[in-house]
Amino acid sequence: MNVESQSEHLKQSKNWYQSLPAEWQNWLNENIENGCDVQKISLILQSHGLSPRVDQYLFSEDEQLSEQLQNELLDYSLEGLETVEILEKIKQKNISNHLIIQFLKHVNNNVIFKKLKQLQQQQNKQRWLLQVMGQLNQLNNHSTSTIDSIETPDFETFIERYYSQMRPVILKGGMQHWPALHKWSPEYFAQHFENELVEVQMHREQYQDFEKKSVQLKRIILMQDFVAQIKATKRSNDIYLTANNAAQNKQFMQKISEDLGDFAKGYCQKEIKDRHFLWFGPAGTFTPLHYDLTNNMLAQIYGRKKVTLIPAWQMPYMYNDHWVFSQVSDVVKADLAAYPLLENVTPFECILQPGETLFIPIGWWHSVESLDMSISVSFTHFNVNNHFFTEYPQDLIR
């Protein structure tokens, strides 16, 4: 379609044209009659939120490209493919090469798309650097398919070998002095806090994305009723008391915090009293793949948990679509045909026993499954900087 016919078609796109305010219709008619460039006209309209879809004025109705095909063409262009390579990619779709070439020409001259390509270029370089970090990590003698399990070292050694290196580790003996380890059980909570109102998540199994809907799944229940429900459940992900319930359960946590203490000597900031988070539920409770915005300790008090971890530098393969979550909830059960990038990840799996504590470094992806009825406590108040979440970028697409 030549410039003259493009101009005429721009006026003849009735639904769009008639939706313009009268002054903009007059402006459009005047500029087209004066022979102004259609693409420049479009950019001005676009800047005022008045522009139609690109292909609605480049092509007639029977020539328009589907939204799916447009997205495919944009993806190929962002990958750096030349027009000839893109045409080869889609030759089986029986679409006129002329339409494709015109569309790509318009897109590549668009100032917004140019900025998008610049950002994509930066992201590609960041991804390359993460890949290099992962490859170099494989040269480390400590880099294996298993996670170290050691007696809790002094705090300086922990910082040097694990915290600062972003290496997960299972620590033994660090909470042997906690009364919680020797007292807490479902029966203990039911007997000593039977009339305590606690907030939990319920009906999780009704939603595939239950973790993203955690706010609407919150319910208030008596502790004795909560314990009765989970004891009557052999295996379920339907009811769970988690860290997401911490704000409402603050008073309850204050009551039981006397059963907790410093981890090993010097690990925690003792003056901070509100950085313990309770996890309590039946066998089968599951927290899907995500990463945390702080370094975390997960202390197992009752029952066992299986934790699957994936290194932070493998984020480019993790289909991170929303906040800290992945489109994939469980990497072990993932459909690799649907999510082929997951073939590049190296999961680490461990089973956490009562009395053991897992250090989960910031940015490390992990999912957690309760193998038994389970009580855990996580905490973040390390005696070093762990205040990174305030600089975390907001999602631009919600």
Name each model-derived stretch.
Residues 1-16, 21-22, 28, 34, ...:
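Fe(II)/2-oxoglutarate
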Residues 98-357, 365-398:
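N-terminal accessory scaffold of Fe(II)-dependent oxygenases
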